[in-house]
Amino acid sequence: MAIQTSNLGYPRIGLQREWKKTLEAFWSNKIDEEQFLTTMKEIRLQHVKVQQEKGIELIPVGDFTYYDHVLDTAYMLGFIPSRFSEFTSYLDVYFAMARGSKDHVASEMTKWFNTNYHYIVPEYEEGLQISLKDNRPLRLYEEAKKELGVDGKPVILGPYTFLKLAKGYNEEQFATILKELVAPYVQLFSELHAAGAQIIQVDEPIFASLTKDEINQAKELYEAIHKEVPNANLLLQTYFDSVEENYEEIIAFPVSGIGLDFVHGKEGNVNAISKYGFPADKILAIGCIDGRNIWRADLDDVLSLFTTLQNQITAKGLIVQPSCSLLHTPIDKTEETHLTSELFDALAFANQKLEELVLIHSALTKGVESISSDLTTYRNAHHAIRSSAARNREDVKVARTSLKEDDFSRPLPFEKRYELQQVALQLPLLPTTTIGSFPQTSEVRQTRKQWRNGDITNEQYNQFIEKETAKWIRYQEDIGLDVLVHGEFERTDMVEYFGERLAGFSFTKNGWVQSYGSRCVKPPVIYGDVAFISGMTIKETVYAQSLTEKVVKGMLTGPVTILNWSFVRNDISRKEVSYQIALALRHEIELLESSGIRVIQVDEPALREGMPLKEKDWDAYITWAVQSFLLATSSVENETQIHTHMCYSNFEDIVDAIRALDADVISIETSRSHGEFINTLKHTTYEKGIGLGVYDIHSPRVPSKDEMFTIVEQSLQVCDPKYFWINPDCGLKTRRTEEVIPALEHMVQAAKDARSLLKTNA
């Protein structure tokens, strides 16, 4: 049986974030289109070359993008909203869809399944002519072949997942639109096959969570495609979970190979193969290296998996590959020499994961003895990190085992608390606030860099932060906001900032991953037991409050978001790590309260994204996620108002969970999703404080007062004015001052108009 190495996708951003820098230089007109395209080609080919040099046989092509692979697919198929029809060039249309423009609202952006990557949501419109507008995968396949002699593996987002992720149609239209996708996909696969593509990877991650009716519908789709292009070798790729419930149907699809996730879906996929076997005429692509985390693989465990599978199946061939695209991991760990040896030795970034694939391939084809020294190295690394003091703290263990039931609930129910809070805070009807951060200007970033490099003193840096804070407190007062924030000028990132101040975290120098577009994040590494050390936000928040008579919110990131936006140790459950973080935050919240801060926001934007793909697994996750939030926030007095914030999510699935958080006020992204959550609230009630975001902060355009007033008006049809707040969709860190101030002025005026309307109607 032939065994090959393969990769599902490579990080786009470049070892020194060249991709990000090129994008932003183009957007700011520092380079022209020709230079942009030339540089992007160089980066793209370099990524192929790295994989070639690492010994990967099936190298992905077409996974590279200028922004997002879902957006690439939408453009390729002609899913271009009519509001962008005035743009003529490819890049103008493409980036307008992604980012919006002065006069055009961007397409919606949301989380890619349960990851921290965001995709641009395809929009279907009536009368849309679906066709293969642009065979970009073919161009990239031919480019790699011509420039590097690499017969690559084209990577395509599959038609079923693509349409399921799209919006703008009703359920009755789905089957019809699906049939319309057959022709362009047939043309795409046919042209790739004719050009010599030996195997074509078709990503269908949504197959992990389909019903029987849906999987049968998808099978009919692939049968229709196969009928027209029977000779194209399609590898149907699933990831992020098992396909256990639909495995029997999936192995009957008319494709040449099937890729399964044996990391995040190991138990289910192994069970399915044990029960149903695997077709002898198909290739099995085994996702055995974790594409979503940064830890070295347990090679003994992986080789044991292959033994189990090889004893049960007689496939046409095997492919050794990651569990998903390596998009979700940093590129290379070699620069992280500042880390302790026990942590450094435990890590594997994208390039190291490629090396692991080659090691496994060697063991399978040449015998385990061919990697005996590597196995010893790996075993020693695993033992060193497991037995480290950082992973065996007695104080953390005692705190966890001492928890009682009343540690997870507030003393009084919401209605009674809110009455006390209204007396204490003296806020108007429809209070206005922001989500937390204000613009991180080049001056802010440069000053922080100087401080970190030791070029300025702590005192100089603190004076600068206080100056920025005071300036924005004045701005907020002048604008007329009701609840102010200190602006978070001291923070690089809403997770990294807290991780730097808690035990159990470590940080990379170059561990960047793409979040959305050119935005890259450097997730903390939770490698040990998490514990409180000292106050993290007290100084800045108390200083801001001293400057104003108005209420200033304390700003924290919640335990589940810190968990979901970090690379997390894999030797204990995520629930246990989340509880450790919650206990540390509980201490911080108590310190804020005792320092006179009466409104404390604990952001949980990542609560929804951490949900398992399968509905049957939701309850268990939601239970411990909600309990983590309650553990962090429930020790405050009734008069202290707890806020939380969420963004980028499909909220209709978790309305009950949002309610169970028992936050006094929740703010939710609304405008970018075109009022989707407002529609959700038409079918359910939410009887606590809520603010539905009235403008999209991800676009540079300044919305008018009337636009915001319309969203407020729509919101008040489903929300009780008594409990309604007015705020932007998200934090304003990435916007410019000249965009933020007029937008907030319009927002405050919209709030005043809404109050007048309520008064008139009353």
UniProtKB/Swiss-Prot annotation:
Binding site for 5-methyltetrahydropteroyltri-L-glutamate: R17, E18, W19, K20, K111, R519, C520, W565, E609
One Pfam short name: Meth_synt_1
InterPro entries from the UniProt entry: Cbl-indep_Met_Synth_N (IPR013215), Cobalamin-indep_Met_synthase (IPR006276), Met_Synth_C/arc (IPR002629), UROD/MetE-like_sf (IPR038071)
Keywords associated with the record: Amino-acid biosynthesis, Metal-binding, Methionine biosynthesis, Methyltransferase, Repeat, Transferase, Zinc
Binding residues for Zn(2+): H645, C647, E669, C730
Residues in the signal sequence: none
Cofactor comment text: Binds 1 zinc ion per subunit.
Keyword check for Zinc: yes
Catalytic residues of the enzyme: H698 (proton donor)
Annotated family: Belongs to the vitamin-B12 independent methionine synthase family.
GO biological process, any: methylation
PANTHER family: 5-METHYLTETRAHYDROPTEROYLTRIGLUTAMATE--HOMOCYSTEINE METHYLTRANSFERASE
Cofactor: Zn(2+)
Name of the featured protein: 5-methyltetrahydropteroyltriglutamate--homocysteine methyltransferase
Pathway where this protein functions: Amino-acid biosynthesis; L-methionine biosynthesis via de novo pathway; L-methionine from L-homocysteine (MetE route): step 1/1
